[in-house]
């Protein structure tokens, strides 16, 4: 008696399954899973692979997502401790690493995470030599440099999530003050993701109307409205969320899916993300910092040359020096 499947279905074609739009997420902690669900909800991949060292947690997360398949449009969700499950990925998102503790600076995490990357990156490269690498783990600017060094990839294919979230937080808070949706509030935070990020006050606008032109004290200590506080809130926000709920997830997950969409759909949108800045803004070392970048199917194809004040440029240079001071001490 023929099996039920054979009675029901007549096969016409022996297919070899090679995914066309595969995305891998390395690390199934709170951030990794927020990235995964955000990507699934945006229908960006035909296959999603999850990788972690904690096998039970990994299998549980995979099964939980698979059970939602009816409500998703990603036909294959796989997982494994072995990196062979990641083969043929277009995009590999790295969220694995030691988690930032309450009150711990992002830079303090660094050597702990370098050691983790020494295992992850060669395995990713082995199975997906043509992928784009999107680094999310903190401190993101330094770890993007680490991923670039270990992978041997050209710099366009190694991207740090950088200030994409900082800028999104900034635009949200700007919108709250002005009573306008964040999408219509334009403002950029550049430089280091974290404590020494640089708000570009001159670029803040709604409908092309410059806030700095209307309110020349914007971002200065003399400002009666204290817009500087908005940037301070951005810097403090991750620490506050970590203090309140233990970690940050949803905003970073949505932010990463936003970047993944630009890459997978070759949108060529401009994002404030971490890229190799040597030779720009007076920076002479191999450091990764966030500037507005054109993001598409080849990763970062172009960088927008932002007009910075001498103070802003000095701030960026100081961040670069701080990062380089740490990078040159790293043990690979």
Curated annotation (Swiss-Prot):
Coiled coil: none annotated. It is found in: Cytoplasm. The keyword Ubl conjugation applies. Substrate binds at residues 106, 138, 169, 248. It comes from the Eukaryota. Keywords: Acetylation, Cytoplasm, Isopeptide bond, NAD, Oxidoreductase, Phosphoprotein, Ubl conjugation. Its main location: cytoplasm. One of its GO terms (molecular function) is L-lactate dehydrogenase activity. The active site is at 193 (proton acceptor). The modification Phosphoserine is found at residue 310. The keyword Phosphoprotein applies. The modification N-acetylalanine is found at residue 2. SUPFAM superfamilies: LDH C-terminal domain-like, NAD(P)-binding Rossmann-fold domains. NAD(+) binds at residues 29-57, 99, 138. One of its GO terms (biological process) is lactate metabolic process. Its EC number is 1.1.1.27. The modification N6-succinyllysine is found at residues 5, 118, 318. There is a cross-link at residue 57 (Glycyl lysine isopeptide (Lys-Gly) (interchain with G-Cter in SUMO2)). Homotetramer. Interacts with PTEN upstream reading frame protein MP31. Interconverts simultaneously and stereospecifically pyruvate and lactate with concomitant interconversion of NADH and NAD(+). This is L-lactate dehydrogenase A chain. It comes from Oryctolagus cuniculus (Rabbit).
């Amino acid at each position: 008696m023929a099996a039920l499947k054979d009675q029901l279905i007549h096969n016409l074609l022996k297919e070899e399954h090679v995914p066309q739009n595969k995305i891998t997420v390395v690390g199934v902690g709170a951030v990794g899973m927020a990235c995964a669900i955000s990507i699934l909800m945006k229908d960006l991949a035909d296959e999603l692979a999850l990788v972690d060292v904690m096998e039970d947690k990994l299998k549980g997360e995979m099964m939980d997502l698979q059970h939602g398949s009816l409500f998703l449009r990603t036909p294959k969700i796989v997982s494994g401790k072995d990196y062979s499950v990641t083969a043929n990925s277009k995009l590999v998102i790295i969220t694995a690493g030691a988690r930032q503790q309450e009150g711990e600076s992002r830079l303090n995490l660094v050597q702990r995470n370098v050691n983790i990357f020494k295992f992850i990156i060669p395995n990713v490269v082995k199975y997906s030599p043509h992928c784009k690498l999107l680094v999310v783990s903190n401190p993101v600017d330094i770890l993007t440099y680490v991923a670039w060094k270990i992978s041997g990839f050209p710099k366009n294919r190694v991207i740090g999530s950088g200030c994409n979230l900082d800028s999104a937080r900034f635009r949200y808070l700007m919108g709250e003050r002005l009573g306008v949706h964040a999408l219509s509030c334009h403002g950029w935070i550049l430089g280091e993701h974290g404590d020494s990020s640089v708000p570009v006050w001159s670029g803040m606008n709604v409908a092309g109307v410059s806030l700095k032109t209307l309110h020349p004290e914007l971002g200065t200590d003399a400002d009666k409205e204290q817009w500087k506080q908005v940037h301070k809130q951005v810097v403090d926000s991750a620490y506050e969320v970590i203090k309140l709920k233990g970690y940050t997830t949803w905003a970073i997950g949505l932010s990463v899916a936003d970047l993944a969409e630009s890459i997978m759909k070759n949108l060529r949108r401009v994002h404030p993300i971490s890229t190799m800045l040597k030779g720009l803004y007076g920076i002479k070392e191999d450091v990764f910092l966030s500037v507005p970048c054109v993001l598409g199917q080849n990763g970062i194809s172009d960088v927008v040359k932002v007009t910075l004040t001498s103070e802003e440029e000095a701030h960026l240079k100081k961040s670069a020096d701080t990062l380089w001071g740490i990078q040159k001490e790293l043990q690979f």
